[in-house]
Every structure is written in structure tokens, then in C-alpha cells.
């Protein structure tokens, strides 16, 4: 197995070291080592089944929910090991939020969707909750569209609005990292453009790690890009460099459409 072509990252917030992941006896990730820089957007690209979503879900231990899952290696969040019994998984998922491929608002009001995580954390002060709702919806570029119907069902929103609501819900608990798993795959081009603009704005406050099949999207929104193939991190670098002058032939073949 060839060595990963990788770039040095300054001020990493997440550090992955020799990470291997198994679904039962099947090895899905092979000794991944990768640093994710703070307040940047990192895209994970590669063909279906390459392990990019598995890697993403390792970062906040969503894979704990999978029967037979097993992790080896280390994941550090600001220097603290994630894969240890001492780690409070609920607190980890507050610090490392998740936006899924399919928008998944709860069958509750828009307001209740945004404050869901805060309620779990024990926040009851209405003034604090009201402020969090407005700030999060403004950050998600949604406030002006929904401010007059906060107590209506979130299920009446458009697909693009629902996905931005899910982003608002993720950032309402003030995470350090936001994971996004194909957040635009079910959206029309106009809604996709809104979410991409939002990702660019959110990098000022949060570290964003996004899985995408859309290489043009990766090129547009990310600062760094990692290419995975068959569970191996093949190449990782500054996005412009990786797309314009990839150092690995396999990377070049993928981004030029020779396979995928």
C-alpha cells in the first residue's frame, strides 16, 4: 500500500492517527492519518464505498451505533482522545455536530427544532433559548424567511429550508466542528448555492468537514481536500493544488473522470 501524499496542517483541531475501522470482519478504513485545520473547510471525496462517510462518522463516534463496529487508532479533538470510555459521547456530539445527507427535522415547530440540543443540555431560560434561535437561524441564513412562523411545523418547509434548519440546529449548541455528509445531494441548484454560501460564511466560527460526491462543490467550498479510495487516504492537500496539480496518478484519474 503506497504512502499517503499529505500536506502539513498548522493549528489542527482534529488529529487522526493510524485510524482503522471495521464493520465486523470487514476493514473499511486502513490506517488513516490526517490533521483537520481549525476554522477551515475540508472536503472528503472519493467514489461510493471508499470510506469517506465512515471516516466522518468516526469523528463524533456516530459509528458506535453500528452493530459489530470496531475502531483502532487515535482521534484527538483539541488534544483529547475521542475513543476512550472516559469521553462523554453526548458532550462529544455537542462539540462535533452533524448534518446528514437527508434533511431530518423533527416533527416539531421550527423553534423547537433549533433548541432541541439546548433542551437536552438542560437550558430552560426562555430568553437564552429565544436568543439562540434567532442567532442560529440568522447564521443559517434562514431567520428572515421563518421569523414569523417559528411555532409552525418544520415539516412544512422546503427541502432547502429544512437543510438550513438542520444546520441551525447543529450550531445552536455552539459546536467547534460541524460534520456534513452530502448536505446538498437532495437539493436543487438554487438551494445548493445557498448552502454553499452558508458553508463559506460558517468557516469563520466553525471547522467544517464535508463529504461530497460533487467534485465541483469540493473545489468551490473547501480549503483542503482529501481523496479516499477503498478505505485508504490516497492524497490530502490544499484544494487548489489537489485539483490543479495532483501528486498521485490515482487522484488525477478520479478528478478527471477516468473512474468513479
Swiss-Prot record:
If you read the UniProt record, what top EC class would you report for this enzyme, in one word?
translocase
User: What is its membrane topology?
Assistant: Peripheral membrane protein
Q: Which GO terms describe its cellular component?
A: plasma membrane
Locate the residues binding ATP. Answer: 46-53
Checking CDD domains in the record gives: ABC_PstB_phosphate_transporter
Q: What is its main location?
A: membrane
Q: How does it assemble?
A: The complex is composed of two ATP-binding proteins (PstB), two transmembrane proteins (PstC and PstA) and a solute-binding protein (PstS).
For this chain, the family text in UniProt reads:
Belongs to the ABC transporter superfamily. Phosphate importer (TC 3.A.1.7) family.
Role this protein plays: Part of the ABC transporter complex PstSACB involved in phosphate import. Responsible for energy coupling to the transport system.
Q: What is this protein called?
A: Phosphate import ATP-binding protein PstB
Q: Which organism is it from?
A: Syntrophotalea carbinolica (strain DSM 2380 / NBRC 103641 / GraBd1)
Amino acid at each position: 500500500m503506497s504512502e499517503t501524499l499529505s500536506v502539513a496542517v498548522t493549528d489542527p483541531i482534529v488529529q487522526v492517527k493510524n485510524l482503522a475501522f471495521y464493520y465486523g470482519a470487514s476493514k473499511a478504513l486502513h490506517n488513516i492519518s490526517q490533521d483537520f485545520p481549525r476554522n477551515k473547510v475540508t472536503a472528503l471525496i472519493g467514489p461510493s464505498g471508499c470510506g469517506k462517510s465512515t471516516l466522518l462518522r468516526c469523528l463524533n463516534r456516530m459509528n458506535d451505533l453500528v452493530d459489530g463496529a470496531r475502531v483502532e487508532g487515535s482521534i484527538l479533538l483539541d488534544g483529547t482522545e475521542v475513543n476512550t470510555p472516559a469521553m462523554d459521547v453526548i458532550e462529544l456530539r455537542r462539540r462535533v455536530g452533524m448534518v446528514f445527507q437527508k434533511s431530518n427535522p423533527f416533527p416539531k415547530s421550527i423553534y423547537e427544532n433549533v433548541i432541541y440540543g439546548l433542551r437536552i443540555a438542560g437550558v430552560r431560560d426562555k430568553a437564552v433559548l429565544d436568543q439562540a434561535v434567532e442567532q442560529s437561524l440568522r447564521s443559517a441564513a434562514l431567520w428572515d424567511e421563518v421569523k414569523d412562523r417559528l411555532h409552525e411545523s418544520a415539516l412544512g418547509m422546503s427541502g432547502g429550508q429544512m437543510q438550513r434548519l438542520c444546520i441551525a440546529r447543529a450550531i445552536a449548541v455552539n459546536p467547534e466542528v460541524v460534520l456534513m455528509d452530502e448536505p446538498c445531494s437532495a437539493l436543487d441548484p438554487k438551494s445548493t448555492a445557498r448552502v454553499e454560501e452558508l458553508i463559506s460564511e460558517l468557516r469563520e466560527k466553525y471547522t467544517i468537514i464535508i463529504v461530497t460526491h460533487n467534485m465541483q462543490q469540493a473545489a468551490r467550498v473547501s480549503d483542503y481536500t482529501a481523496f479516499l479510495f477503498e478505505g485508504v487516504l490516497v492524497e490530502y492537500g490544499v484544494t487548489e493544488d489537489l485539483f490543479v496539480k495532483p501528486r498521485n496518478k490515482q487522484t488525477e484519474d478520479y478528478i478527471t473522470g477516468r473512474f468513479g
